[in-house]
Amino acid sequence: MGQKVHPHGLRVGVIKGWDAKWYANKKDFADNLVEDNQIRKFVKKELFSAGISKIEIERAAKRVKLNIYTAKPGVVIGKGGSGIESLKKKLTNYISGKNILINIVEVKSVEAEAQLMAENIAAQLEKRISFRRAMKQTMQRAMRHGIKGVKTACSGRLGGAEIARTEHYHEGTIPLQTLRADIDYGFAEANTTYGKIGVKVWVYKGEVLPTKKVEKEEANA
């Protein structure tokens, strides 16, 4: 059976960057990695209603900077920045003895962000909305935002069936093997009365061409 590699991991260093931007020696590497994982889990849980699509972590000597990509920056920031101050205090349980900086980045096209799309489908499944309807409506909204293609998959006891299965739907093109293709990927889980249902979303936003090649072509023209 053909297995799918993670679209982001496959393109790291080619057209995509790292979500963890830091360097550590062998002694500290494992601790930093565990700390990163705990931070991401906590922030996603604490700010779930804000629609977090991505969290980037940058580290310096005694400083940790979080770039939080969110659909609702007002929910994260709070009244007069109270939300950020509260988040910083809670993060001291995971980050000790370091200065914490939080940068909020607004996600413009929420309907075409793979992680937010997956979470939206999962939320609808938990409200007992038909999985086919949830998937198709989410895909149609995304296609209106000018993306090249979208694919969704739901796995589990769909509709309360005795036997678990996977159903896929797609619109447009999704070139998963093309490294220059900008593929956004999101995963979420829906906790239903019949058990967990996994939701995966792939969004194709177009090709990313190497800048050097484009510059050469422009010079030759």
Curated annotation (Swiss-Prot):
Pfam families in the cross-refs? KH_2, Ribosomal_S3_C
All copies of domain KH type-2, residue ranges: 39-108
Does the record bear Ribonucleoprotein in its keywords?
yes
Q: Which CDD domains does UniProt cross-reference here?
A: KH-II_30S_S3 (cd02412)
Molecular functions (GO terms): mRNA binding; rRNA binding; structural constituent of ribosome
Q: Which UniProt keywords apply?
A: Ribonucleoprotein, Ribosomal protein, RNA-binding, rRNA-binding
Cellular component aspect of the GO annotation = cytosolic small ribosomal subunit
Q: Which GO terms describe its biological process?
A: translation
Q: Which family does it belong to?
A: Belongs to the universal ribosomal protein uS3 family.
Q: How does it assemble?
A: Part of the 30S ribosomal subunit. Forms a tight complex with proteins S10 and S14.
Query: What is the stated purpose of this protein?
Result: Binds the lower part of the 30S subunit head. Binds mRNA in the 70S ribosome, positioning it for translation.
Q: What is this protein called?
A: Small ribosomal subunit protein uS3
> From which organism does this entry originate?
Clostridium botulinum (strain Alaska E43 / Type E3)
Q: What lineage, starting at the top, does this entry show?
A: Bacteria, Bacillati, Bacillota, Clostridia, Eubacteriales
